[in-house]
Design a protein with these regions (language model features):
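All-alpha prenyltransferase/terpene-synthase fold signal
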Residues: 1, 5-159
């Protein structure tokens, strides 16, 4: 819920506000709000994935800190739903550990449970929904191309 609220503030609301200020139609405002929500969520999921499977250098921040901080990201929640690994994932997330072996074990579980692939696919699906939201709405062609490029960049970025 917090993630969705944050995406409203950082993605959906600014785009909708821009459309309102620019004199956009109700259809344009709603399309840009939906686009911002979907791309904002996709961006966050990609950020979570980079924190887990990127490199410390590429992430340009602390590596695997989401595990240390016990964040219940989409990846973690998906892995927790697997009964075979629930207790171990819960223990690692609750421990506050920064032990590289424990962090690597968590990522190994995330891979074994398909949680990383699940999150990546979900982010791609959100990107498709974002693009569909603006597909049949009248927009400046250059603005449309920029929005579509941004949507792709958000899930393809490496840092």
């Amino acid at each position: 819920q917090m993630c969705i609220r944050d995406r409203y503030y950082s993605g959906a609301t600014p785009l909708a506000a821009g459309a309102i200020i620019g004199g956009g139609s109700d259809e344009q405002i709603e399309a840009l709000r939906a686009f911002g929500l979907h791309t904002g969520l996709a961006f966050q999921i990609q950020d979570d994935l980079l924190n887990l499977v990127g490199t410390k250098e590429a992430a340009n921040k602390d590596f695997r800190t989401d595990i240390t901080e016990g964040k219940r990201t989409l990846v973690a929640v998906h892995a927790l739903s697997d009964e075979r690994h629930h207790d171990e994932v819960e223990a690692i997330l609750s421990s506050g550990t920064d032990d590289p072996a424990q962090l690597a074990r968590a990522v190994e579980i995330f891979q074994e449970t398909g949680s990383i692939d699940y999150a990546h696919t979900y982010a791609l699906d959100l990107t498709a929904k974002a693009k569909a939201a603006i597909e049949n709405v009248e927009l400046d062609p250059h603005a449309r191309e920029l929005f579509l490029s941004m949507a792709d960049f958000f899930v393809e970025r490496l840092n």
